Amino acid sequence: MIRVESIHKRFHDQEVLKGVSLNVEAGQVVCLIGPSGSGKSTLLRCINGLETHDEGAITVDGCAVHAKSKHIHELRMQVGMVFQRFNLFPHRTALENVCEGPLFVKKQARAQARENARHLLEKVGLGHKLDAYPSELSGGQQQRVAIARALAMEPKAILFDEPTSALDPELVGEVLNVMRQLAYDGMTMIVVTHEMSFAREVADRVCFLYDGTICEEGAAADLLERPQHPRTRDFLRRVLTSSDAPST
């Protein structure tokens, strides 16, 4: 489904990704963990075509991803993205935010777009907030609207860039519950997260990134409970509670 082969990405003199390779099969959930600045978000943006990689190759469902590709807009529609900061249109209701892409990018009929948006908002638990503006919604509700908006484009995969990092702690669970349901429904997902319990429960694989490389990857339980690389162990000690800390 998603193939990343030895990609490099530089910003001026700084190399942010240093030969990263990653394969994600259809229906899999892969969580990316690691310290800030390790290249996790940049990797997602390269997969989605929001950033151009300098070397290597990325394919989604057999189609090459590159900013210069004449098919880049079609490729971006196949890979949805949910950001840290919601990025909703403040002057549009929840329903209108979800309708935006289908109406203006996919050219759906308005009635169909609205019906689909209504269904998706109900799916994320916001059927009672169709006419609410972002300023009238909590952070967790706004992020659920953002997830519904991504789903409205009928993507083959969704990339999540720390979707709960901007939320108050009491709102994190409602967003993770929606993501769990997507995983159980078979959505292909790559998730940058610091929510280790979510990764342990939902992910098929976890990849630990450090300094632009994947230092270690493996089945979620194996990597989180029995990490092999010293940097992975050090990172997990810092982010996990003592009761969840991996053995040495």
Listing of model-derived features with the role each one plays in the protein:
Residues 1-220:
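ABC family nucleotide-binding domain
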Residues 210, 217, 221-248:
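C-terminal boundary and immediately downstream tail of ABC-type ATPase nucleotide-binding domains
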